[in-house]
Amino acid sequence: MPNIPTIPLASWIDKLVDGLTQFEGFFNVITNIIGGIVDAFQWVFDLVPPWLFIILLVFGTFWVNRKGKKWGLIIFEVVGLLLIWNLDFWRDMTQTLTLVLTSSLIALVIGVPLGIWMAKSNIVESIFKPVLDFMQTMPAFVYLIPAVAFFGIGMVPGVVASVIFAMPPTVRMTNLGIRQVSTELVEAADSFGSTPWQKLWKVQLPMAKSTMMAGINQSIMLALSMVVIASMIGAMGLGTRVYFAVGRNDAGGGFVAGIAIVIVAIILDRLTQAFNKKAKSE
């Protein structure tokens, strides 16, 4: 705009990031915690041979979905995972699962309590709603910049960026699920002298479980959508295969890695949906 000074917003943000990087000890603690979770998941995946992993997944699917249509999913799991194994993508797939599961676990641990807090206070909800809107609408690439500044490169900054991008659905659906619990049920719990914690654990959370699971499903899918972006800052996995294929203009390699990501996405999505149906039936 002519004759109007430019607001130095970018400079302010740079100074804020530079100031936060001075808290190196704090970020080292977070790095060690997240790194420990990542190493634990990867150790388990490396310990289990591919054939045993497939068998365990089939049994898990059968148990979760024993009352529903399960054979189509089981056949897809077996064929899809055998294809990934045959293409020599197994290690990449387990690294991708490590990133997704770690991000989803952290998003769940932070998001559910935050959603409960929002459900209990309209003021808190009014404060965090625009924050969640900001987190979901900001391009995911932008999160890589502060993640690298605070945590360096590797799996940890990839997990942090994925958590920020994937957490809002869990928070929103937890808040929504608790608020949708029938007031008659809440009043009945009050009439029996339930404490706020008893009311939360025995009435509100069980009734909101289905809605919360829908949010968790969305968070898992969003975390999986970050695998290619996270590969740009050193997070290993199938996303790295896609990223390298783009750099080499390798259409075949990129599509094959993309198909592997799609297989993982479908399996995770169908499993969480089956778990949600099982929770509803109970």
Swiss-Prot record:
Residue ranges of domain ABC transmembrane type-1 in the record: 93-272
Transmembrane segments: 44-64, 70-90, 99-119, 140-160, 220-240, 251-271
Keywords: Amino-acid transport, Cell membrane, Membrane, Stress response, Transmembrane, Transmembrane helix, Transport
GO terms under biological process: amino acid transport; carnitine transport; choline transport; glycine betaine transport; response to cold; response to osmotic stress
Main location: membrane
Quaternary data: The complex is composed of two ATP-binding proteins (GbuA), two transmembrane proteins (GbuB) and a solute-binding protein (GbuC).
CDD domains: TM_PBP2
Lineage per the UniProt record: Bacteria, Bacillati, Bacillota, Bacilli, Bacillales
GO MF term set: amine transmembrane transporter activity; amino-acid betaine transmembrane transporter activity; carnitine transmembrane transporter activity
Cell compartment(s), UniProt: Cell membrane
UniProt cross-references to InterPro entries, sorted A to Z: MetI-like, MetI-like_sf
Family the UniProt entry places it in: Belongs to the binding-protein-dependent transport system permease family.
Protein name: Glycine betaine/carnitine transport permease protein GbuB
Inhibition and activation profile: The complex is activated by an osmotic gradient or by low temperature.
Membrane protein topology class: Multi-pass membrane protein
Cell membrane found in the keyword field: yes
Function: Part of the ABC transporter complex GbuABC involved in glycine betaine uptake. Responsible for the translocation of the substrate across the membrane. Involved, with BetL and OpuC, in osmoprotection and cryoprotection of Listeria. Can also uptake carnitine when carnitine is abundant in the growth medium.
Organism in which the protein naturally occurs: Listeria monocytogenes serotype 1/2a (strain 10403S)
Pfam family, one: BPD_transp_1
GO cellular component, one term: ATP-binding cassette (ABC) transporter complex
